[in-house]
Structure formats: structure tokens, C-alpha cells
């Protein structure tokens, strides 16, 4: 009887050990997100998508606080910290596009990487291990100028335009800016000024610029910076955005038309694609995110409400 009891107990113990070691029990992967100005509410809709994907994929996602991150070196320090902490993958929007080659090489030698909103000026490196989730910057910039033309016509001779371009150290912003400049030039418009920098820097510069006929903002931060200026001088404001301030200004009629990237899908797909790479290494994938043209008249349609105010936002 004693021998039988010992045998049964041994079987139970071995079964328990096997269960604990069983490969069918999945690991909970940890993913880190490092984007500029992460505390800005322009990321709220992106974070909603991240949270839903996190629940569906059963992963942990850490959106790193990037307050005070002003240079690529600052960002690299945060990246290194996450790698030391054992992150399984990094979702990164670089604060600057130049000189990123070595940073990318270093990251992919240590963990998985997905580039967000980043078409870096790094054509000489192997991108096979780097997925991207991004906008088509030329398309969205072209569509933005079309919105202006739809309202004021295509002949902009003798018209002056001001452009707010936030961070021109990012390749994506340069693409938008160059596209808008080329189209406006062909339409005969005079570009009065191009203001860039942080939100506070742009607001300060706007105190000293000439008053144009139209203002264009090339991202959420740019639009935020131009709202008070446009309201003060009753200037039509157009742009690419989606922050809470942007949406309020659209509702008030300060922003005439706004192109809103589907940030929820961007967040969701970024996490989903990263999980796929962690589990099943694959050839490089690039996903292009849609955007929507929204104005005061259509902002509360069923589709546009879901873009501006996603569930859980």
C-alpha cells in the first residue's frame, strides 16, 4: 500500500512539473511604445487601439513617458532602458529621421522593431527585419491642398498662405511640407512663411508673422498652435490632425477641414503586427493607414464619430 501511494504521488508530481513546463502555455509578451510627446492627447485614439489589441492579443504594452525627450540621443536612452528591462519588441516613432541607421541596427540586433509613422532617410540599411505602420504622406498632403481648392478654387494667384510644420526633422513631415509647397506653387500662391518647432515655439513665432489669407497645419501639434492665431484674425485654417483641441476647433468652425488619420487602427495594427513578428519572424511588412476628410458639417456622422471618438477613448 505504501509503495502504491508513493508511485501515485510521484506521478502527480511529475504531471505537475510537465504542466508547468508545457510549451502549450503561452508567454505574455511585453511591448514598449516610444513616441514623441507621448502625454499629448493627440495620442489618445492611438492608445485606445493599443489597449484593445493588448487585450485581444494577451500582451503587456508599456507606453513610455517621453516628457523631456528632445533629441534622438534622448530617445536612444529610453530605447536602451526598455531593452535592458527585457522588452520583447519596440514600436517607435523617431523624433528625427537623420542619423537613425546605427540606432535601428542596434535595436534589431537585440529585439524586435516596428517603425511608426516613420519613413526614415535610411536607404542603405537592411529593413527586412523592420515592419512599418504609417500614413502615405504625399497622398494626405495632396488631399489636404485639394480641400483648400474645393473651397476657394485652384487659382491662388495673389493669395498668401502660412504653413505650420512642427517637427521638420522628421522625414514624414518633410514629405508633407514639400508636397504642399509644390502644389501651392503651381497654383500661384505665395507662401508667406513656414513656422516649425514645438507647440510653444510655433505660438511664439506666430506673434511676429504677417497675416496670410489661409493657414495650413501639417499635424495635430501644428493645428493646435494655429487655432488661436486663426481665431484672432479670422483666417481659414486647414490641416491634418485629431487632437481634442483640433476636434473642438473643427466643431467651432475655426478649422474649415481636417484630415484625420485612423489612429485607433494605427495603434491596434501596430501591436498586432508586432505580436506576429515576435511569434513568427517574417519578411518586412508595411501597412498604410487610412485617413478621413472631416468638417463641421459631417463630423457627427456615424463613421466620423467612430474616428473622432472611438469606444474607450
Regions flagged by a language model, labelled:
Residues 2-17:
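Hydrophobic membrane-insertion alpha-helices, especially the h-region
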Residues 32-48, 53, 62-72, 95-97, ...:
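Extracytoplasmic "Venus flytrap"
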Residues 42-57, 140-144, 168-189, 266, ...:
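Short, solvent-exposed amphipathic alpha-helices that sit
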Residues 62-84, 192-210:
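Structural motif
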Residues 94-109, 113, 194-247:
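Hydrophobic alpha-helical
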Residues 99-139, 243-251:
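Flexible loop/hinge segments that line or gate small-molecule binding clefts
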Residues 131-158, 242, 246, 261-279:
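Hydrophobic alpha-helical segments within soluble ligand-binding/sensing domains
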Residues 265, 269-313:
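Hinge/cleft segment of the Venus flytrap/periplasmic-binding protein
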Amino acid at each position: 500500500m505504501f509503495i502504491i501511494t508513493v508511485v501515485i504521488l510521484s506521478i502527480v508530481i511529475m504531471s505537475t512539473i510537465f504542466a508547468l513546463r508545457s510549451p502549450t502555455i503561452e508567454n505574455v509578451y511585453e511591448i514598449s511604445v516610444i513616441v514623441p510627446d507621448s502625454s499629448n492627447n493627440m495620442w489618445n485614439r492611438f492608445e485606445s487601439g493599443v489597449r484593445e489589441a493588448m487585450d485581444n492579443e494577451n500582451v503587456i504594452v508599456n507606453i513610455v513617458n517621453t516628457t523631456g525627450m528632445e533629441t534622438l540621443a534622448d530617445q536612444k536612452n529610453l530605447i536602451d532602458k526598455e531593452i535592458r528591462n527585457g522588452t520583447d519588441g519596440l514600436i517607435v516613432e523617431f523624433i528625427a529621421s537623420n542619423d537613425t541607421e546605427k540606432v535601428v541596427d542596434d535595436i534589431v540586433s537585440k529585439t524586435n522593431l516596428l517603425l511608426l509613422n516613420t519613413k526614415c532617410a535610411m536607404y542603405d540599411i537592411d529593413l527586412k527585419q523592420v515592419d512599418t505602420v504609417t500614413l502615405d504622406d504625399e497622398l494626405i498632403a495632396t488631399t489636404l491642398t485639394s480641400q483648400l481648392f474645393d473651397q476657394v478654387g485652384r487659382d491662388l494667384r495673389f493669395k498668401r498662405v502660412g504653413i505650420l510644420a512642427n517637427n521638420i526633422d522628421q522625414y514624414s513631415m518633410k514629405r508633407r511640407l514639400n508636397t504642399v509647397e509644390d502644389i501651392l506653387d503651381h497654383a500661384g500662391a505665395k507662401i508667406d512663411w513656414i513656422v516649425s518647432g514645438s507647440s510653444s515655439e510655433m505660438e511664439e513665432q506666430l506673434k511676429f508673422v504677417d497675416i496670410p489669407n489661409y493657414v495650413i497645419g501639417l499635424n495635430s501639434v501644428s493645428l493646435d498652435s494655429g487655432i488661436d492665431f486663426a481665431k484672432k484674425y479670422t483666417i481659414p485654417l486647414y490641416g491634418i490632425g485629431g487632437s481634442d483641441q483640433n476636434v473642438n476647433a473643427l466643431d467651432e468652425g475655426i478649422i474649415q477641414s481636417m484630415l484625420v488619420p485612423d489612429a485607433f487602427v494605427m495603434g491596434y495594427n501596430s501591436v498586432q503586427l508586432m505580436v506576429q513578428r515576435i511569434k513568427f519572424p517574417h519578411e518586412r511588412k508595411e501597412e498604410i493607414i487610412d485617413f478621413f476628410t472631416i468638417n463641421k458639417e459631417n463630423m457627427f456622422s456615424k463613421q466620423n464619430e467612430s474616428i473622432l471618438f472611438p469606444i474607450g477613448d
